[in-house]
């Protein structure tokens, strides 16, 4: 197990928090001016303004193939369908012995999304964030995404942001983008929660501002763990591993299999594509051992390529998203099956779930007690309040009991 855990390279996030702190503080003080300065100094991009204009959106549609736009629309429909059907009941009410209680979910009013750039553009992330946010009822949904060297946002990303119904989009990346959304600038809307994946600097900035705004989860490099038996298709598994490894030099791919033949074939295929220090294949005694290891590793993506995979789903305790069978590639979930691809990494699946409609909701509880309810529990409330030394808690109940 230690050998598997070591595949995740240890990075001190505290060091990066210290690096981004001056950036965050400058944006907090100076607003747009600081964002534009850091975009020039760190990214080599000169900007006149931060907000993406309607004209830029129109030109983006002209630059993107119609077939690709149609594909994004299909992905949006599937993402909407899954997230709508699986979202929590908004208004729950119960009654116990004349005491009416309930829980009501309401949307977070303002949310900011970070849409990564850098090594690649990620229009799919716009859909993964925007669709559940709008189902939740977020009133103001904004996004920051890094501009290209010419000061423009990738056209495909802009089209996806428009399809996902974002209200405003800003040309900013890195820690300066996170700070702008956390504290607001002359142009960028101050939000109540920031979501979306990014590099180590983005993650550090999110953790730094988390004392002032909510965040979704810490994010690290992409990862996959595959559990396979002799029925698995080694070529499929190798491709799934390579799909994660192409994201980032620090991405991780692990295969646990009961079949030596599958192990050898997967290893040969992956290594023929490059030397990946964060890739490993292990032969295990049985599937029970594989699931035990997987639950400790808590992978972002878990592929279960075994006979009757659904029968093993109950063994999964910790995973961001699970892909069952030989024909459920991670890429399907990344783009268009309907589940979300903004997922916990680096073992955080032990304590976080992936992005969902609930990520954009908060709840409050309510209660309405009748005189009979007050008579029934009032004496117990007084006893507990007095035991805690809280005189007026007890008195607030005692006064009511006297009137019943």
From Swiss-Prot:
Gene3D superfamilies: 1.20.5.1300, Nitrogenase molybdenum iron protein domain. Binds 1 zinc ion per subunit. GO terms for biological process: L-histidine biosynthetic process. Substrate binds at residues 222, 244, 247, 301, 334, 388, 393. It is an enzyme of class 1 (oxidoreductase). The active site is at residues 300-301. Belongs to the histidinol dehydrogenase family. Catalyzes the sequential NAD-dependent oxidations of L-histidinol to L-histidinaldehyde and then to L-histidine. This is Histidinol dehydrogenase. It comes from Archaeoglobus fulgidus (strain ATCC 49558 / DSM 4304 / JCM 9628 / NBRC 100126 / VC-16). The gene is hisD.
